[in-house]
Amino acid sequence: MDIFSEKRILTVSQLTSLIRGVLEENFEHVWVEGEVSNLATPASGHLYFTLKDGAAQIRCVMFRASSRALKFRPRDGMGLIVRGRVTVYDQRGEYQLLVEYLEPRGIGALQLAFIQLKEQLAREGLFADEHKKPIPPLPQKIGVVTSATGAAIHDILTVLNRRFANVEILIRPVKVQGEGAAEEIAAAIDDFNRYGVIDVMIVGRGGGSLEDLWAFNEEMVARAIHRSRIPVISAVGHEVDFTIADFVADLRAPTPSAAAELVVKSKEELAARLEFLRHRLVQGGRQVLAERRGELDSLNRSLRDPSMLVGHLSQRVDDLSARLERGTANSVRRHRGSLDLLTTNLRLTNPAVRLERARERVIALAGRNETLLRRFLDHLREKTLVAAARLDTLSPLATMARGYSIVLKLPERCLVTDSARLAPGDRVELCLRRGRAGCCVESSSDT
């Protein structure tokens, strides 16, 4: 009798299949918590890792269809809570957990995804101040990326029309939450940059939960803002809400209404600024005029009396003329003495030829002396005229020729340069370009 005739003999595959059926039937949906180790993320998009605690471990796999929905990236050492079903991997004869959903232990998945992306972009320098573009002080065209039906666009338009109705507004309607919202927002930012028709851009929406605002935490939106050549103002949610877009944007506004107030100044503010600048310009002009007036007064005080200068020059000309006359007379006397000596010698020797030569020499010397004297006098006269012309240019007389006058207080005839030295009833004399005039002071002012 065959001892194996009543026994059921299974193949390895059959046994494995039976075990898999038992496990999958009894552990169809289980929640398990543990620590991640041996995490692998191949190009296929699947996740392979081990979930362990202090006493045991189980292999886990999460296929690409499920892993692509994750908002955060699991890491070795991270505590996870996973949901899945227990199955058997036939090729190794090992049981494993087929994970359908997972979340970080102790913190929400979205919050962890926010922290991870923020740290990554900060390391890449997307939040650095050197990338922040200045907001134009008075934009002509403003682009708005938001929902066409939300409260945000209404608030933005209301504030802009109230503060500066002349500004042109271009609205790019997009989804601001749900599937596809991040793609639409990033595309709208790129479109505005592609066409380049605006000066500044507002990107935002009204308040909501973390899930509602999540499109503004997506990496594609952050990178679209960072590569924008047009300055971007983020205006997402309420004042307490912060998104990744806020950190990347060139300026963060706490609400859409605040963004509209930041992007344009009101007409009243601009008018007040212009009045302030006008006042500064007038004050500066008055100060410059006062400084130039002081410099002119200083120059007038430093100049000597032109008539005295001309008198000194005339006296020097007379002195030089007298010296020339004396020099000429002495020269003539010397030559006359020489002539007399020659005449005496000629009378003694009676040489006709020598006498004629001596006469010619005397005539030549006299002519040369006269020429030199004339040249010297002409040169001196020319220098005198040039000096007189230069003095006339610097003289207050030239200024008086343009309508100015010199004021002398009577009876002491002292020069007046400050109205504070005059009082009503004082007698003054005006020195004009031609002539003088007596006047009586009726009033005086320092302006």
Curated annotation (Swiss-Prot):
Keyword Ion transport: no
Keyword Methyltransferase: no
Single Gene Ontology BP annotation: DNA catabolic process
GO MF: exodeoxyribonuclease VII activity; nucleic acid binding
Keywords: Cytoplasm, Exonuclease, Hydrolase, Nuclease
GO CC annotations, alphabetized: cytoplasm; exodeoxyribonuclease VII complex
EC number: 3.1.11.6
Catalysed conversion reaction: Exonucleolytic cleavage in either 5'- to 3'- or 3'- to 5'-direction to yield nucleoside 5'-phosphates
Cellular localisation: Cytoplasm
Location, primary (coarse class): cytoplasm
Annotated transmembrane regions: none
CDD domains, per the entry: ExoVII_LU_OBF (cd04489)
Family: Belongs to the XseA family.
Subunit structure: Heterooligomer composed of large and small subunits.
Record's function text: Bidirectionally degrades single-stranded DNA into large acid-insoluble oligonucleotides, which are then degraded further into small acid-soluble oligonucleotides.
Name assigned to this protein: Exodeoxyribonuclease 7 large subunit
Record organism: Geobacter sulfurreducens (strain ATCC 51573 / DSM 12127 / PCA)
Gene expressing this chain: xseA
